Regions:
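Catalytic phosphate/metal-binding cores of nucleic-acid and nucleotide-processing enzymes, i.e., regions
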Residues: 1-109
């Protein structure tokens, strides 16, 4: 029996994505893990009520982050470009999340 294959890696990735959602909620944002399946580049959407008044949508004020969670901390250039394009299309901020003594975030715009 082979251990540590794609199934194990997927479960590890799923657990990390849920940890990122919980971390986003901890810092005061609403967050949701997206259903995956068609090669989607966005793993998590996170929204925070805007405190600086720089953005409005239907008289609601918020900031939006599109997050790609990478357990190993590496995002290939194609994924990076796709995430940036998705974020630009809706005026969101693209973030990569990775694990290094807790959850770290990097704005990749």
């Amino acid at each position: 029996m082979v251990k540590g294959g794609n199934g194990s890696r997927k479960r590890k990735g799923d657990r990390f994505e849920l940890a990122v959602v919980k971390d986003q909620e901890r810092i005061g944002r609403w967050a949701a893990k997206l259903r995956q399946g068609g090669g989607e580049v966005v793993d998590i959407v996170s929204i925070e009520k805007c405190q600086d008044g720089r953005c409005t949508a239907h008289s609601h004020v918020s900031h939006v982050w599109l997050i790609q969670a990478k357990v190993g901390g590496y995002m290939n250039p194609v994924e990076r470009e796709r995430l940036v394009m998705e974020a630009q299309a809706i005026s969101a901020t693209p973030l990569m999340a990775w694990k290094d003594k807790g959850i770290q975030y990097k704005d990749i715009s």
